[in-house]
């Protein structure tokens, strides 16, 4: 795989959360949620971040997307330093980066139909007409093996594997 470009390069990533105590909410320590994590993902490479519950997998992903700011370390996506981007530039960059959880039930709003869940990233990142959104939603749902009828269902009406396909569709639609 050495001939493939590095798409994501994470170097010495650390994410700490302050522990506050007392009446004045003074910081009395830190939870070390992510401690010195480094890895690279190359083009055409499949990557899975695995570990026991509470070990920092989700926090690592959210930190890479800068939904949580890193305490220290470096994050490069396609050669660009994500830590140097302002909020708007990072929001735009997130179109190219998505997290897909093993069972994404918690990340799918239970009050939204699959159609609405798939429209949401389109509304966030693009200015499309309703007809344009309908076309994109239909195309991506079929690409991940969901029928048009399933677009009107809610996340709890799907199996774990089907919910994962919905999450993958959300990641790909942007």
What is each residue range found by the language model?
Residues 1-174:
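ABC transporter nucleotide-binding domains
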């Amino acid at each position: 795989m050495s001939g493939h470009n590095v798409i994501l390069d994470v170097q010495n990533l650390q994410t700490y959360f302050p522990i506050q105590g007392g009446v004045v909410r003074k910081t009395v320590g830190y939870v070390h949620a992510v401690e010195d994590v480094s890895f690279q993902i190359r083009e055409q490479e499949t990557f899975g971040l695995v570990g026991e519950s509470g070990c920092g997998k989700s926090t690592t992903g959210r930190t890479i997307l800068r939904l949580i700011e890193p305490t220290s370390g470096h994050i490069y996506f396609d050669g660009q330093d994500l830590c140097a981007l302002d909020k708007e530039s990072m929001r735009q960059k997130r179109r190219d980066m998505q997290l897909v959880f093993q069972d994404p039930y918690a990340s799918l709003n239970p009050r939204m139909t699959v159609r609405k869940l798939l429209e949401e990233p389109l509304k966030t990142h693009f200015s499309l007409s309703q007809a344009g959104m309908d076309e994109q939603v239909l195309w991506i749902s079929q690409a991940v093996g969901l029928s048009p009828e399933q677009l009107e269902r809610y996340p709890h009406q799907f199996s774990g594997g089907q919910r994962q396909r919905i999450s993958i569709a959300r990641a790909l639609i942007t």
